[in-house]
Amino acid sequence: MPKTYEITNKIRTLRFFANEMSQQTLAELTGVSRQTINAIELGKYTPSLDLAYKIAHVFGVLIDEVFEYKIANEIVK
């Protein structure tokens, strides 16, 4: 039976601590639409590796500080 996985993120929290940055501002800084940022935050869309790095760069953090990959009940870092 294949393991199920989930990618979660801390984008909303990072935006809050970045002077309450709007989704629109983050979208402009990363070259995507506000709707894309919203879908990523809600877990409805998994970003490409390139976009994930761009998001991390905007906040000045490592990619694994933004995104977390979970397999079933374990956390993979």
Task: Give the location of each predicted region.
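DNA major-groove recognition helix of helix-turn-helix/homeodomain DNA-binding modules
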Residues: 50-65
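Short, charged recognition helix plus adjacent turn
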Residues: 1, 57, 67-77
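Residues within the helices of the helix-turn-helix
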Residues: 12-13, 24, 49, 53
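A short, Lys/Arg-rich alpha-helix, primarily the initiator
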Residues: 1-18
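Short alpha-helical DNA-recognition segment
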Residues: 20-39
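DNA major-groove recognition helix of helix-turn-helix
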Residues: 15, 41, 59, 70
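The alpha-helix within a helix-turn-helix
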Residues: 15-16, 27, 56
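Amphipathic, hydrophobic secondary-structure cores in small proteins
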Residues: 38-53
